[in-house]
Amino acid sequence: MPIVTLPDGSQKTFDSPITVMQLAESIGTGLAKACVAGKIDGVPVDTADVIEHDAEVSILTPRDQEGLEIIRHSCAHLVGHAVKQLYPDAKMAIGPVIDDGFYYDIDFGQSVSPEDLEAIEKRMKVLIDHEYEVIREYVTKEQALATFIDRDEPYKQEIVEGIADGETVRLYHHEEYIDMCRGPHVPNTRHLKAFKLTKLAGAYWRGDANKPMLTRIYGTAWADKKALKTYLKRLEEAEKRDHRKLARKLDFFHMQEEAPGMVFWHPRGWTLWQTVEQYMRGVYKDSGYQEIRCPQIMDVSLWQKSGHWDNYAENMFFTESEKREYALKPMNCPGHVQVFNSGLRSYRELPVRYGEFGGCHRNEPSGALHGIMRVRAFTQDDGHVFCTEEQIEPEVTAFHRQALAVYRDFGFDDIAVKIALRPEKRLGSDDNWDRAEEALRNALSRCDVEWEELPGEGAFYGPKIEYHMRDCLGREWQVGTMQVDFMMPTRLGAQYVAEDGSRQAPVMLHRAIVGSMERFIGILIEHYAGSMPLWLSPLQAVVLNITDAQREYAESVTQRLQKSGLRVKTDLRNEKIGFKIREHTLQKIPYLLVVGDKEVEAGAVAVRTRSGEDLGSLSVDALIARLQEEGV
């Protein structure tokens, strides 16, 4: 006689074990119709799972985030069903859930076109209309292996072979199609109607460039057609804001095959970069950081001592010279320790804070590269604090407040704070990790801020606070970090003279606010759709003459504005004024300053904004005052 406790605290008693679906039916037909899965004592389960003992049970529907993820996972299986009907020789790999959707990696043995994607989506809709039951089956490892050998699915075979002997495997049957998964999955395809396949991409099997290149089919799925439509509209807007397209249009940067994952900055883009860098340089100064510069290439022995060799070598670039092996730095921290070690420090000097706009190189897989959001060569606003254990909390607290102020200045107010906790592969003792994680929690508590904890997501040398910005489209971007590290100073021999005269290893705090400068600028471009705030705009105004008669005056206005510290140029081309206005509006220049005979006579300019607003005639002095005030 199981007693079931529901989320609202109410209880239901049954004479015999019941399934999750039967429980839903006992509550109401509407709930049963919407039920996609359940949770028994917090564990997600299929609707066919049996409640055999007293338990806390909740019914999952498409309105629940977990229910929505189950729908997305089931849609990935539906992709497999449709693909195998249309392309029987295709080999299925993996199909996980991702943010806002899912994907399936498939070896088609041929190129796949957008027309193929449309055909697969069309077949999925036909299968959904069948409203067939999704059947779960428990089998042994040997039975699962036999199933996929019989179906000539080598990638599935490889996955099964990696499962521990004696472990039970779940198979899910979509009519004649069989897939494997931990589940749970929807009980019927009628729950999958609000979906859309979005794009094709390439991906190496297991992320290994030495293994076959597969076709990745991306898709999204939602609770209903209205939510799907809203998301697709957001996706369309994101496409318009794609920083790669805007960069070409606005002449910010380009990338090319000869330097994959590396950026060719153009004058306007580099001006934007320098504006961000100079702002962050001011943050260094205001926060008591001394700016330093370290080598790009260092002997591998340093990386072996730091722990990067054992934990990060696959992501590093190497080179040789005169029979010595060197590595391009993937991180700045070991170099900063060398600067700290260059002299004997006293406890009275701590905390010592170093900052560097440090260029790093990481050997990211080619399939993971994405414009300037994911690159192989990048620069960080990196900083490291060498301090005592007692100084951790005040340093982290000060950093937290500084980071939030920076994000506000760049136009981001919606910031989620998360603590990434110890990963399975890590350096140091559990005691060190306990103290480091608790120090971060205590610092955030002092700031009266809520946070989410991410088990297993910390770096190999320490836990970290992550700052996630939400942009105008509701997308979340992880930018800043603050990391506690007890290990690296010891490994690299960092010491200070303590108050009692003993030699002690300092604690090292790794911090960055914007993180990768390239990525942060990409986020800014997309957040503002290229229409940067005045202070960030590479070109803040353009002076446009109507005829050659105003050439000299236009040049004098430009010179006055430039001497005032504004980024301005003159457009003296023999083109119609309407053409010039339109061209610079499309270039998203904040202010267009038109000068004709009337403006020359009055010593003024006619001011228009990129949004089309006519601000009328302003004297040059009044204009300078306005722009300087807005650009602060």
From Swiss-Prot:
Catalysed conversion reaction: tRNA(Thr) + L-threonine + ATP = L-threonyl-tRNA(Thr) + AMP + diphosphate + H(+)
Gene Ontology CC entries for this record: cytosol
Cofactor(s) this protein requires: Zn(2+)
GO biological process assignments: threonyl-tRNA aminoacylation
Binding site for Zn(2+): 333, 384, 510
Record keywords, A-Z: Aminoacyl-tRNA synthetase, ATP-binding, Cytoplasm, Ligase, Metal-binding, Nucleotide-binding, Protein biosynthesis, RNA-binding, tRNA-binding, Zinc
TGS domain: residues covered: 1-61
Region (Catalytic) location: 242-533
Binding note for cofactor: Binds 1 zinc ion per subunit.
EC code(s) of this entry: 6.1.1.3
Record carries keyword Chaperone: no
Keyword Glycosyltransferase: no
Single Gene Ontology MF annotation: tRNA binding
Enzyme class, first EC level, given as a word: ligase
Family affiliation: Belongs to the class-II aminoacyl-tRNA synthetase family.
Assembly mode: Homodimer.
Name the UniProt record assigns to this protein: Threonine--tRNA ligase
Lineage per the UniProt record: Bacteria, Pseudomonadati, Pseudomonadota, Gammaproteobacteria, Oceanospirillales
